[in-house]
């Protein structure tokens, strides 16, 4: 039987790693959009630097 990879499981499982990668890609795209729309890096936009 094939393992369901979209189920949310805690720990180092293949499903959890898939979700981690998907959420990391969304965060990276959000950082790129913030930088391109504001002309500042994410840390400058948030006032950290």
UniProtKB/Swiss-Prot annotation:
Protein name from the UniProt record: Uncharacterized protein Ycf17
What are the record keywords, sorted? Chlorophyll, Chromophore, Cyanelle, Plastid
Q: Does the keyword Nucleotidyltransferase apply?
A: no
Query: Family, per the entry?
Result: Belongs to the ELIP/psbS family.
Domain of life of the organism in this record? Eukaryota
Cellular-component GO terms for this entry: cyanelle
Question: What function is annotated for this protein?
Answer: Possible role in chlorophyll and/or carotenoid binding.
The Gene Ontology terms for molecular function here are: chlorophyll binding
The entry's localization annotation reads: Plastid, Cyanelle
